[in-house]
């Protein structure tokens, strides 16, 4: 996989979804930072990295609940800078409010929008999607280039439509999938035919943010290019 996953579960699981990758410039790029991510990254050799980026998809607690802790750990223990990347100015404002309430000084981290990282070889675009009505126009996925691979990461989404223009042949798709719930997430049964059609174009489909990992694995067991993400 292009991404390494620290968690793959939904909001009520014990392993909230988060992933990361490393760059040739000794950067660690983390996608979302729930509390689980803060716990798990401490077991990685973080000293080898010179800088951390955290890409935020949206501000639900199971996606940014550990962000403030990670900022403090990077600053006070690792002595390394953290850049938090928000997909929009509105989301950046919400992140600032949340981190300030938690007692984080804005001087401890850099908070930018995606316009500040367009020069990064691994970044292409953020993708507005539909998820929670309470966060209308504040939920995003990302289009990334990792090790020369076209990567589409949906974040939490109830639709595939915004991501279709980015899914070129041979891409890797990491997609929010629910076995039972659906509604504000893609339901696996409803999306499976779309996933199968993607694989016919050489697209690798990885399922994440799952409410039932075992059930999802059984449902896609017969499809070689559709699978549940594995944990790092």
Where are these regions (language model features)?
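Metallo-beta-lactamase
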Residues: 81-82, 86-139, 228-231
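Residues in the short beta-alpha loop(s) of Rossmann-like NAD(P)-binding domains
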Residues: 34, 88-90, 210-213
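Cap/insert and terminal regions of metallo-dependent hydrolase folds
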Residues: 159-232
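Structural motif
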Residues: 27-29, 50-55, 149-153, 171-172, ...
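Metal-dependent catalytic neighborhoods of phosphoester/phosphodiester hydrolases
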Residues: 65-74, 97, 215-220
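Active-site metal-binding motif and surrounding structural segment of the metallo-beta-lactamase
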Residues: 36-85
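Active-site flanking residues adjacent to catalytic metal/cofactor-binding acidic residues
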Residues: 31-32, 57, 154-155, 175, ...
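Core dinuclear metal-dependent hydrolase active-site scaffold
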Residues: 1-47, 114-165, 232
């Amino acid at each position: 996989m292009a991404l390494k996953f620290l968690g793959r579960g939904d909001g009520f699981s014990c392993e909230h979804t988060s992933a990361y990758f490393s760059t040739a410039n000794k950067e660690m790029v983390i996608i979302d930072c729930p509390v689980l991510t803060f716990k798990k990254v401490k077991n990685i050799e973080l000293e080898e990295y010179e800088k951390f980026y955290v890409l935020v998809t949206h501000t639900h607690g199971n996606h940014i609940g550990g962000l403030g802790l990670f900022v403090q750990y990077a600053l006070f223990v690792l002595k390394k800078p953290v850049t938090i990347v928000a997909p929009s100015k509105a989301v950046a404002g919400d992140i600032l409010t949340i981190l300030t309430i938690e007692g984080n000084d804005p001087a401890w981290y850099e908070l930018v929008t995606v316009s500040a990282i367009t020069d990064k070889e691994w970044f292409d675009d953020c993708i507005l999607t539909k998820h929670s009505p309470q966060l209308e126009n504040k939920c995003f996925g990302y289009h990334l280039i990792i090790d020369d691979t076209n990567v589409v990461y949906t974040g939490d989404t109830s639709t595939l439509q915004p991501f279709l223009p980015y899914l070129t042949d041979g891409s890797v798709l990491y997609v929010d999938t629910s076995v039972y719930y659906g509604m504000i997430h893609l339901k696996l049964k409803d999306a499976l035919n779309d996933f199968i059609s993607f694989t016919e174009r050489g697209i690798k489909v990885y399922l994440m943010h799952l409410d039932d990992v075992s059930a999802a694995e059984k449902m896609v067991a017969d499809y070689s290019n559709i699978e549940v993400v594995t944990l790092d």
